[in-house]
């Protein structure tokens, strides 16, 4: 299935003062040198033009819709306009532009759910800036889950995956303090995270029989209870349940021996118990080409595995590889899924 048959990837602008505009321009400008799926930038065309001028780039920009984006992509950077209400200064975020950030997300999600765009890719946002403007969600992912639930009437449990050429890793708990992880690791949360991950690996990643390796929480996976009870009392019963339901699952495994080359050959995804247990190996093995994928949503969502990098904005030094990887993976998952919805 070609990109023309499934529509462009809808790419949100992210925080306009960050590097989102810079890396978007770089990806498009280098499209002739490497495979780049057609995308539709949902954001401020004037911002893109100003950033291109600041960076010394000549980038033609055209305002268009989804079908027009695919047709125009080789000649111009297609934009679905969402205007920023306040002037944008690279590196200086302004809460006055928070409404444009969320409007771009809302618009892109609507386009994907309507089947006009094939998938969603999101440039980085600043939670601190959005909080200043009254944003009430813990982060980007939770906001997307709320939009999906309101659109479909079905609550979604979003699951975070870092996907790179050498490793896919999923943290069960995400942005919580390490001291709170043991209490947050409930059997239901571990089970749902694993089943959602397996379902998306089948339907979107083209893996009919995914292999899951589940990490323990404690050193040496608890060492029979000597170093903690969670591995045997909480994690192991979930693994037994998953196996009984036919999933290919191993664990709980000591995390310090899960990520070397030979170990990674034995599984398709590592299910980790907390944020750094998953993201440290994922980023160490593929910092520039790892992609943040949100599983469990009724649409495909990817993003680069970095933040707004305000200190780099407008300087021509931000690297675009992770965004390109996010766009490529979004298009690949859409082709695998045969459309946009679960």
Swiss-Prot record:
Cofactor binding description: Binds 1 divalent metal cation per subunit. Can use ions such as Zn(2+), Mg(2+) or Co(2+).
Q: Which reaction does it catalyse?
A: 4-(phosphooxy)-L-threonine + NAD(+) = 3-amino-2-oxopropyl phosphate + CO2 + NADH
Subcellular location per the Swiss-Prot or TrEMBL entry: Cytoplasm
| Residues engaged in binding a divalent metal cation | 175, 220, 275
**Which Pfam families does this UniProt record tie to the protein?**
PdxA
Record GO terms (molecular function)? 4-hydroxythreonine-4-phosphate dehydrogenase activity; cobalt ion binding; magnesium ion binding; NAD binding; zinc ion binding
Q: Name one GO cellular component term.
A: cytoplasm
User: Its Gene Ontology biological processes?
Assistant: pyridoxal phosphate biosynthetic process; pyridoxine biosynthetic process
| Cofactor annotation | Zn(2+); Mg(2+); Co(2+)
**From which domain of life does this come?**
Bacteria
Question: Under which pathway is this protein filed?
Answer: Cofactor biosynthesis; pyridoxine 5'-phosphate biosynthesis; pyridoxine 5'-phosphate from D-erythrose 4-phosphate: step 4/5
Q: What is its main location?
A: cytoplasm
Q: Which residues form the signal peptide?
A: none
Q: Which InterPro entries match?
A: PdxA, PdxA_fam
Keywords, alphabetical: Cobalt, Cytoplasm, Magnesium, Metal-binding, NAD, NADP, Oxidoreductase, Pyridoxine biosynthesis, Zinc
Task: Supply the EC number(s).
Answer: 1.1.1.262
Gene3D superfamilies xref list: Isopropylmalate Dehydrogenase (3.40.718.10)
Which sites bind substrate?
Answer: 140-141, 283, 292, 301
Family, as annotated: Belongs to the PdxA family.
Q: How does it assemble?
A: Homodimer.
Q: What does the protein in this record do? A: Catalyzes the NAD(P)-dependent oxidation of 4-(phosphooxy)-L-threonine (HTP) into 2-amino-3-oxo-4-(phosphooxy)butyric acid which spontaneously decarboxylates to form 3-amino-2-oxopropyl phosphate (AHAP).
NCBIfam families in the record: pdxA, PRK05312.1
What does the miscellaneous comment read? The active site is located at the dimer interface.
The protein's name is 4-hydroxythreonine-4-phosphate dehydrogenase
Species of origin reads Rhizobium meliloti (strain 1021) (Ensifer meliloti)
Q: In the record, what lineage is assigned to the organism producing the protein?
A: Bacteria, Pseudomonadati, Pseudomonadota, Alphaproteobacteria, Hyphomicrobiales
